[in-house]
Amino acid sequence: MLKFISLGCKVNSYESSALKELFFLKGFNETSKPDIIVINTCSVTAVADQKSRQIIRRERRNNPNAIICVMGCYSQKNAEYIKNECNADIIVGTSNRRNLVDFCVDFIKDKKQIIAIDDNPRKFTYESLGTIAIPNSTRAYVKIEDGCNNFCSYCTIPYTRGVARSRDKDEVISEISTLVEHGFKEIVLTGIHTAHYGLDNNGCSFSDLVEQIRNLYKFGMLQICSTKSENEQPLLSSP
């Protein structure tokens, strides 16, 4: 009764997996003939915008009786268009996603369109989506950060996801501990800009987080995604 479509980056993939687990915990399951379709959109380029629109319309056309839920960067800045032109049932952006299961339950009861968009991403806090289900793989992605402080002229991310916010250190460590216990040999830290971790003064710098992970857990490889050379803080301390 459930189908997820995730467009764009690794962060979107991670968030879709985490949300899928929340649905599973409420008794939903995946199927080829879904009653609920969740589309996690991307808006990093004009091409990504177009693809997001096409997917939403396609799923509505092919599944006229399904509940269509749209979330992500494209819906954050285009909720009115999705409401009026794509006929989606539930629209959230890059916040309020943790409430998506409850929104679906409410829609099943009331059949009333739900739009839950917070229109000031700069005030967003880190939204914890819980721990992802254990996939059948030796590599696991762990999200540690959301948002970006760079405000590049060509990029919409700070306007759709907000400025950098860090995930609680203990939550990161707990998720990695679970993954290591399940035999994972490769952990990939991911986020919109992982080196921005800790810049919101959460009490732990990015380099401190990496050092704690390396000291606590002895697994094969620790990788870091989505960081750049102009970091505002050292990535790692000297050995």
Where are these regions (language model features)?
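Conserved AdoMet/S-adenosylmethionine-binding subsite of the radical SAM
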Residues: 47, 51, 201-239
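Proteins enriched for Cys/Gly/acidic motifs involved in redox and nucleic-acid/cofactor modification
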Residues: 1-197, 211, 235
